[in-house]
Each structure stands twice: as structure tokens, then as C-alpha cells.
């Protein structure tokens, strides 16, 4: 089983950007820890991060034939990107939307997601643990539905 983790803009700054909201772990730390969990479950996890909307769209489109499921923390693109939404829909790859913070308890503009209604699930507000919960969720979903 191949799963793609996509991280959007500014998530490369984890560990230094607003640690009171996002914690102290770097994206590299999170990816290493997630890969350990994935390997224990015989899952191939590919990690991708970009600050550029088009690169994320390209990655989704190029993954159609090789990826079983997607985990996506689209960052600020969650609230703005119709093109990422359309790429996810067009790919027909099941995806879990995830967020470190609870986007529904933050600023008004963060409460709207262009992805939620098309995701198989959403994990939000559990800090870095959101990544691990999302991984467990997509594995379970794919195990039942494939």
C-alpha cells in the first residue's frame, strides 16, 4: 500500500513557526516518525511539501497510478485553493484532511475548508498527533475498502 503525505505552505517552518500553536517538532522529525510507523505496518509512505499551489496539484495528478491514499495538510491552501480541491476530486484517490491546530476554533477565515466535504475524514486539533491519527485512519479505510 502506497500513501502520499502532502504538506502545504509554511509547514516547512514547523519547529520554529508559532510553536505555541504548532509545537516544536520539525517537519523532518514528523516525517521520520511517520515513516517508522508506516514501515511497521508494511506501508510505503511518500512525503512531499511545497509552498506552491501548482506543485501540489502536479504531485496529486502524477500520483494517480501509484498512490492508494493521500494525507493532506494543505496549510493556508485549505481555505483558498479550488485547484487543489479539483485535483483531489479528479484523482479519485481517497484522502484525509489533517490539521495540527483546530481550524474550527481559530480565526473566522480558517473555519472554511475547500477540502472537508470531499475528504473521507478530517483530523484537526490534536497537534502533531493529528498526522498519526490520519495515517491510522487512511490505513483502516483502505484496508476495509480495497
Curated annotation (Swiss-Prot):
Q: Alphabetically list the UniProt keywords.
A: Amino-acid biosynthesis, Aromatic amino acid biosynthesis, Lyase
EC annotation?
4.2.1.10
Q: In which pathway does it act?
A: Metabolic intermediate biosynthesis; chorismate biosynthesis; chorismate from D-erythrose 4-phosphate and phosphoenolpyruvate: step 3/7
Q: What class of enzyme is it?
A: lyase
Q: Name one Pfam family in it.
A: DHquinase_II
Which CDD domains has this protein been placed in? DHQase_II (cd00466)
Q: Extract the InterPro entries matched here.
A: DHquinase_II (IPR001874), DHquinase_II_CS (IPR018509), DHquinase_II_sf (IPR036441)
**Tell me, which GO biological process terms does this entry list?**
amino acid biosynthetic process; aromatic amino acid family biosynthetic process; chorismate biosynthetic process; quinate catabolic process
Quick check: keyword Amino-acid biosynthesis in the entry? Answer: yes
Marked site, Transition state stabilizer, at 17
Quote the function comment for this protein: Catalyzes a trans-dehydration via an enolate intermediate.
PANTHER family tied to this protein = CATABOLIC 3-DEHYDROQUINASE
Q: What family does this belong to?
A: Belongs to the type-II 3-dehydroquinase family.
Instruction: Kindly provide the name given to this protein in its UniProt entry.
Output: 3-dehydroquinate dehydratase
- What organism is listed for this UniProt entry? Prochlorococcus marinus subsp. pastoris (strain CCMP1986 / NIES-2087 / MED4)
Amino acid at each position: 500500500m502506497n500513501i502520499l503525505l502532502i504538506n502545504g505552505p509554511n509547514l516547512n517552518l514547523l519547529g520554529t513557526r508559532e510553536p505555541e500553536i504548532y509545537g516544536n517538532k520539525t517537519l523532518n522529525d514528523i516525517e521520520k516518525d511517520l515513516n517508522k510507523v508506516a514501515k511497521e505496518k508494511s506501508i510505503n509512505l511518500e512525503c512531499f511539501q511545497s509552498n506552491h499551489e501548482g506543485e501540489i496539484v502536479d504531485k496529486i495528478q502524477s500520483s494517480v497510478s501509484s498512490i492508494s491514499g493521500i494525507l493532506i495538510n494543505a496549510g493556508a491552501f485549505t481555505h483558498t485553493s479550488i485547484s487543489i480541491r479539483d485535483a483531489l476530486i479528479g484523482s479519485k484517490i481517497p484522502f484525509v484532511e489533517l490539521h495540527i491546530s483546530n481550524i474550527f476554533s481559530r480565526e473566522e477565515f480558517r473555519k472554511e475548508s475547500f477540502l472537508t466535504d470531499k475528504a473521507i475524514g478530517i483530523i484537526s486539533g490534536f497537534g502533531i498527533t493529528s498526522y498519526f491519527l490520519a495515517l491510522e485512519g487512511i490505513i483502516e479505510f483502505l484496508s476495509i475498502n480495497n
